[in-house]
């Protein structure tokens, strides 16, 4: 899930002051931001109180089921079209993708109320850890399911740095070195590093990213004999069954 944190209120106030916004509509997210405790109903109420303390009027609020889902967000904003039209601006308590989706769904100025910090694992309620950089060139098959790109502050791929001491990280001194953990887990599984990992291919993650699942389905649905029809599934093997 995308982990978010509250944006500095002074920045939000400055954004709204810049356009002279006196009325604001608040939009939250029912998924990641709600779980992270940054964009659910309690946080919307806190933002509402802060806006009112600044002398602004909150025309209404809503929580989209998934803020980054364009179709769902457009449907949700249509339900509140009157309140949104009455607002000078929309404050979005969601990740950056959610903010952009709301901005694509309304014609009012849209501002982020949160900062997106990382793609995180839920360790337990209210505790999150960054585990993946979404680099597009995964090495977990070689590192026993521990990502050195993310869990090593220096992003080293082939072993610890010279600053590792007694198995602990030089940078985050209260944490075990990622490469020590990788070595231990490989040993526990009876595995060993068969080769050194090549330097990261950062071209595997070009910005902005885009994946079109429909494109593959449409290609595979073409009649036999068509040069564009491969019949291959997601991993290039047997065709996938369309369960949609």
Give the ranges of each region predicted by the language model.
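Short, polar loop motifs at secondary-structure junctions
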Residues: 94-99
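Iron-sulfur (Fe-S) cluster-binding modules
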Residues: 1-65, 77-90, 104-142, 146-244
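ATP-dependent adenylate-handling ligase core
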Residues: 68-70
């Amino acid at each position: 899930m995308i982990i978010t944190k509250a944006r500095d209120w002074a920045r939000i106030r400055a954004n709204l002051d810049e356009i002279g916004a006196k009325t604001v509509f608040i939009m939250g997210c029912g998924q990641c931001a709600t779980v992270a405790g940054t964009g659910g109903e309690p946080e919307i109420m806190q933002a509402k109180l802060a806006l009112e303390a600044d002398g602004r009027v909150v025309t209404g609020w809503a929580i989209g089921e998934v803020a980054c889902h364009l179709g769902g967000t457009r449907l949700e904003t249509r339900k509140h079209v009157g309140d949104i039209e009455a607002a000078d601006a929309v404050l979005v308590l969601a990740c950056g993708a959610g903010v952009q989706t709301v901005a694509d769904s309304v014609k009012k100025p849209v501002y982020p109320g949160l900062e997106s910090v990382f793609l995180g694992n839920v360790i337990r309620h209210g505790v999150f850890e960054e585990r993946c950089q979404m680099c597009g060139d995964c090495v977990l098959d070689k590192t026993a399911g521990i990502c050195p790109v993310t869990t090593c502050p220096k992003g080293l791929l082939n072993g610890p740095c010279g600053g590792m001491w007694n198995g602990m990280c030089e940078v985050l001194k209260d944490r075990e070195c990622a490469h020590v953990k990788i070595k231990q887990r490989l040993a526990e599984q009876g595995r060993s590093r068969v080769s050194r990992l090549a330097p990261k291919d950062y071209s595997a993650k070009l910005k902005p990213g885009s994946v079109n699942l429909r494109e593959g389905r449409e290609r595979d649905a073409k009649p036999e004999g068509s040069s564009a029809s491969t019949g291959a599934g997601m991993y290039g093997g047997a065709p996938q069954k369309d369960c949609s």
